[in-house]
Regions:
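Extended glycan-interaction surfaces of carbohydrate-active proteins
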Residues: 47, 51-160, 184-190, 196-199, ...
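Alpha-helical support elements that line or immediately flank enzyme active sites
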Residues: 162-192, 416-428, 469-482
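Aromatic/His-enriched, Gly/Pro-containing loop or helix-boundary segments
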Residues: 193-235, 527
């Protein structure tokens, strides 16, 4: 969101020695699948130096993301030099300086007018072209990392692809018959793994230091389910490369208890490896610079690096922010994300390991059987370790774990507990116990609530989020609670439809407790669009129309290396 009444459209005079420049029009066109990466990627925080810091703290933009998505009209180094030379001159205007030298981004879907006489489903299908970006061209002055194939973005301020969002968007694309677009997005993710070594948070340079919940294997499985298993084989190398990214450093961990490096953790002496969220940087996020910086300034210098690292790791989790990650649920400064073993992350990696094992076995080349056995064993080791560490028999629920002590966070139950059900690694008894508590405490008039704590953060009560609704609904269905799954589905779809009829919008999150209140919390206004909301709504609506999902019962978690798809 930009402020200032459209001031950026005016070329204002600035008392500086620099020469004014004019904007050029950006276009997109179809490009080769072997799209090269720019030789020097534009990194706003690094390349603009003091100008970046000053703009982000100035309040020129209400949203820190606006400036990092803006395109410099001349070389960033020249802009930085101009600023250094002219910023102390009499009458200097920072706002005017930025207006002359940057092309500012516009929200996705701006100008789209909703026809509320359409059904919600028809509205969503009409939005797919609005939310779809054509293949990118290489632009060394953009923070956008170009992708070679079309892709769907969430909408609003989110003008780029987002990793875990895309799985839930794909559910709706498949329900719309758009497996071609799903394939394009899978090809883009494989391209990112091949060029930058992992799937970043989003295709922006400022997201490169972290990823997001690793749903790539689930995407491949869903695509294969919608087409055929052979369609998954081209992604096997990328799946293994992504797994290596998440397991980087595992071989170098000492055998003792409580060892960690980047995203890998050895919980107990001689025990298997589990994973945590991480970020390779420990400074304020460029896209949320002002709020990060201002909170950091309330801490002593010795605590800031750890705070920023935890902020970034929380962004990698996708749950930014939530009482789930804070020692004090009311104090963001107490984030401890890097000290936690998340139950959902390890469920995802279990599924990825089983998927790789299954695809290796399916392909059947020389050596594949041995590799399949290795990954199947890794998955089983992870399953056993996670069930032992994260499941609390007394309360019948899964919790995140403080890896330094092995303590389960039993005072912080969240919808992350549904992930072991969705991915089929919980025992039948555990699945029944978790489902019972979800029904008893988390099911609200509009669906499942994210946590039981109202902290003011957006990933807390009273909010419900489309990805968590899907995982929870289908997780309890997988463990025999079809009636509960159907009830939650109908409540969520009812809330989606009610909001759509009242506002003409599909939003990124909803208040599931007070159905008349717009969801709140977070660092930015609730966004319209919205990719994962659309995807989950279409998939659930299609499921309701067509009857139960074909995979509705527990499959043995010790199953062999057959192809694995998500439920």
């Amino acid at each position: 969101m930009e402020v200032g009444g459209g001031w950026w459209r005016l070329l204002l005079a600035v008392s500086t020695a620099c020469i004014a420049t004019t904007s050029t029009t950006c276009t997109t066109s179809k490009t080769s699948p072997n799209l090269p990466q720019p030789p020097g990627r534009y990194d706003p925080a690094h390349d603009l130096g003091q100008l970046f810091h000053d703009v982000q703290l100035s309040g020129i933009f209400a949203d820190s993301k606006t400036f990092v998505d803006a395109r410099p009209l001349v070389a960033p180094a020249d802009i930085a030099a101009c600023y250094a030379a002219g910023r102390t001159a009499a009458g200097f205007s920072l706002q005017a300086f930025v207006a002359q030298r940057f092309e500012l981004p516009r929200p996705v879907g701006e100008g789209f007018h909703t026809d509320t006489s359409q059904t919600m489903e028809a509205h969503i299908r009409a939005l797919w072209p609005i939310l779809t970006r054509r293949p990118d061209t290489v632009d060394a002055r953009s923070s956008l990392i170009p992708l070679p194939n079309p892709y769907v973005v969430p909408g609003g301020r989110f003008r780029e692809v987002y990793y875990w969002d895309s799985y839930f968007t794909m559910l709706g694309l498949i329900a719309s018959g758009r497996t071609d677009l799903v394939k394009s997005m899978l090809d883009n993710f494989a391209h990112l793994i091949g060029t930058v070594g992992h799937i970043p948070n989003g295709n922006r340079t400022y997201y490169l230091s972290r990823s997001q919940p690793p749903f790539f294997a689930a995407m491949v499985g869903r695509f294969a389910q919608a087409t055929d298993t052979a369609q998954a084989l081209p992604y096997l190398d990328a799946l293994e490369a992504e797994h290596a990214f998440w397991m980087n450093g595992a071989d170098s961990l000492a055998p003792g208890r409580g060892q960690a490096y980047r995203r890998v953790v050895r919980l107990r002496e001689g025990g298997p490896i589990l994973n945590r969220y991480w970020d390779d940087r420990s400074d304020p996020r460029p896209e949320s610079y002002r709020p990060d910086y201002e909170v950091g300034q309330t801490l002593g210098a010795e605590r800031r690096e750890g705070f920023y690292r935890n902020v970034r790791a929380t962004a990698e989790s996708g749950w930014d922010f939530s009482s789930r990650w804070m020692r004090d649920p009311k104090d963001l400064r107490t984030l401890e994300t890097t000290d936690l073993l998340p139950v959902d992350l390890n469920s995802l990696l279990y599924h990825a390991e089983r998927t790789i094992a299954a695809l290796r076995a399916f392909r059947g080349r020389a050596g594949d059987a041995d590799v399949a056995r290795q990954f199947a064993q890794a998955a089983e080791d992870r399953r056993r370790a996670l069930l032992a560490a994260a499941y609390d028999p007394a309360s019948g629920f899964f919790y995140d774990v403080r890896w330094r002590t092995g303590q389960r966070l039993t005072d912080r139950p969240t919808l992350a507990a549904a992930s072991p059900l969705y991915f089929g690694l919980a025992t039948p008894e555990q699945g029944r116990a978790v489902a019972a508590r979800l029904e008893r405490e988390f099911l609200k008039p509009g669906g499942f609530v994210t946590t039981l704590i109202a902290s003011g953060q957006q990933w807390d009560a009273p909010n419900g989020w489309p990805p968590l609704e899907w995982l929870t609904i289908e997780g309890v269905r997988r463990y025999g609670r079809a009636h509960l799954a159907d009830a939650a589905r109908d409540r969520w779809l009812g809330l989606n439809r009610r909001t759509y009829r009242a506002t003409g919008k599909m939003t990124e999150k909803y208040d599931v407790v007070d159905l008349q209140r717009r969801a709140g919390g977070g660092e930015y206004p609730t966004q319209d669009g919205f990719g994962w909301t659309n995807g989950v709504a279409l998939a659930l609506a299609a499921q309701k129309a067509e009857g139960p999902h074909p995979v509705s019962r527990v499959r043995s978690s010790a199953a062999g290396a057959r192809f694995v798809v998500t439920p």
